[in-house]
Amino acid sequence: MDPNCSCPTGGSCSCAGSCTCKACRCPSCKKSCCSCCPVGCAKCAQGCVCKGASDKCSCCA
């Protein structure tokens, strides 16, 4: 799998449960990569694949 997950807009890509791509924003997985967020962060749990340390969380700011 391409580590950059560079699929075309509206295309598909194979997003694993644990995020190994750098910019995965594909309709096929309906998730985007973000830093790991605190357990209580519903937004991150619903829309992100965990990547990075929790102290660098950006999707729940």
Curated annotation (Swiss-Prot):
Describe the family membership recorded for this protein in Swiss-Prot or TrEMBL: Belongs to the metallothionein superfamily. Type 1 family.
Q: Which amino acid positions bind a divalent metal cation 5, per UniProt?
A: 34, 36-37, 50
Q: Domains: what does the record tell us? A: Class I metallothioneins contain 2 metal-binding domains: four divalent ions are chelated within cluster A of the alpha domain and are coordinated via cysteinyl thiolate bridges to 11 cysteine ligands. Cluster B, the corresponding region within the beta domain, can ligate three divalent ions to 9 cysteines.
Q: Where does a divalent metal cation 4 bind?
A: 33-34, 44, 48
Can you name the source organism? Bos taurus
UniProt keywords, alphabetically: Acetylation, Metal-binding, Metal-thiolate cluster, Phosphoprotein
Q: Which residues carry this modification: Phosphoserine?
A: 58
What is the name attached to this protein's record? Metallothionein-1A
What the entry lists under PANTHER family is as follows:
METALLOTHIONEIN (PTHR23299), METALLOTHIONEIN-1G (PTHR23299:SF22)
According to the UniProt record, where is the region Alpha? 30-61
Which residues does the record give as a divalent metal cation 2 binding sites?
Answer: 7, 13, 15, 26
Gene that this sequence comes from: MT1A
Q: Where on this chain does a divalent metal cation 1 bind?
A: 5, 7, 21, 24
What's one GO-annotated cellular component? Answer: nucleus
Under the heading SUPFAM superfamilies, the entry gives: Metallothionein
- Main role? Metallothioneins have a high content of cysteine residues that bind various heavy metals; these proteins are transcriptionally regulated by both heavy metals and glucocorticoids.
Q: How does it assemble?
A: Monomer.
